[in-house]
Amino acid sequence: MLFDQIASNKRKTWILLLVFFLLLALVGYAVGYLFIRSGLGGLVIALIIGFIYALSMIFQSTEIVMSMNGAREVDEQTAPDLYHVVEDMALVAQIPMPRVFIIDDPALNAFATGSNPQNAAVAATSGLLAIMNREELEAVMGHEVSHIRNYDIRISTIAVALASAITMLSSMAGRMMWWGGAGRRRSDDDRDGNGLEIIMLVVSLLAIVLAPLAATLVQLAISRQREFLADASSVELTRNPQGMINALDKLDNSKPMSRHVDDASSALYINDPKKGGGFQKLFYTHPPISERIERLKHM
């Protein structure tokens, strides 16, 4: 059951990443069609930009993300309990010991980042360390170590980069349209254009406007799939499903983080740091904790 869930979530995540690349290609084609009279040229440029974004994030993610979240690095002397739990989980998972950080925040949360198991780090809030017992802390760190072992950290980083590239291209196109770039380039075509030309123009405009929203939803879907996988993988490491269930229950009752968490980092956390209601639920970076608990109960 556990390995079936892991395999299923991995397949779904790669499908979602493919959708990301298709969205990037669509925006690139639309921008190229509108502004340089070459949809294919725009597509190629967009894919190159996405590749550059992904590479830059992969090689710089750890320092950038930890700095953005106000995390401070600790060691065996300054945070022995957390350090030893992470060390134990890394040993069981057969990965190198990740760097360990603490975020001074009363909310209960944690995340992992990095480009690969050899260059990874985990962070936990001070609130989590104050509330969780040993078994629950092991479950949470097992969850984060699983993100590292399963290369979720790399996939999440690529997703952030591609979403940023799509948003950047759409924003650039919007500014160009504001200054009349598309109108000047296609004014003659539109004056005598046929139905197909008008349809292509409308579709291109819709792609530019809607692609960032679609990219956000795909990024959230990737995060949600990886959370299910990491929950299951944590149980595999600890052999203690009840510990994970108890930890999730405490996370569910935690308040939002007091410090500002940017959208790119939100998807990394074990618990959505920006809790809200109503329409905001559509943009939650995580599946409902009640659903995560139910899946664990039926493993």
UniProtKB/Swiss-Prot annotation:
Its cofactor is Zn(2+). Its EC number is 3.4.24.-. GO terms for molecular function: metalloendopeptidase activity; zinc ion binding. It is found in: Cell membrane. GO terms for biological process: proteolysis. It is a multi-pass membrane protein. One of its GO terms (cellular component) is plasma membrane. InterPro entries: HtpX_protease, Pept_M48_protease_HtpX, Peptidase_M48. Its main location: membrane. It holds the Pfam family Peptidase_M48. The chain crosses the membrane at residues 15-35, 39-59, 158-178, 198-218. It is an enzyme of class 3 (hydrolase). Keywords: Cell membrane, Hydrolase, Membrane, Metal-binding, Metalloprotease, Protease, Transmembrane, Transmembrane helix, Zinc. Gene3D superfamilies: Metalloproteases ('zincins'), catalytic domain. Binds 1 zinc ion per subunit. The active site is at E144. Belongs to the peptidase M48B family. This is Protease HtpX homolog.
